[in-house]
Amino acid sequence: MWKLWKFVDFRMTAVGFHIFFALIAFAVHFACISSERFNWLEGAPAAEYYMDENPGIWKRTSYDG
């Protein structure tokens, strides 16, 4: 493996990998924003369907004490 780094610059390879993964992350996030189900900027219509009539009140589920 050490012979590989004689031909390839490690710093440029590391920078290239970071840029590549950042582009993949941006693509995934933009794909989520463009879909109706996973768009967190425009509100969540699926979450509004499941909301309780009093969403600000915490309910105890383990005990009634």
Swiss-Prot record:
Residue ranges of the TM segments: 14-34
Binding residue positions for a bacteriochlorophyll: H29
Highest taxon, organism lineage: Bacteria
InterPro entries referenced in this protein's UniProt entry, alphabetically: Antenna_a/b, Antenna_alpha, Antenna_alpha_CS, Light-harvesting_complex
Full protein name: Light-harvesting protein B800/830/1020 alpha-2 chain
Topological relation to the membrane, as annotated: Single-pass type II membrane protein
Pfam families, sorted: LHC (PF00556)
Chain's role: Antenna complexes are light-harvesting systems, which transfer the excitation energy to the reaction centers.
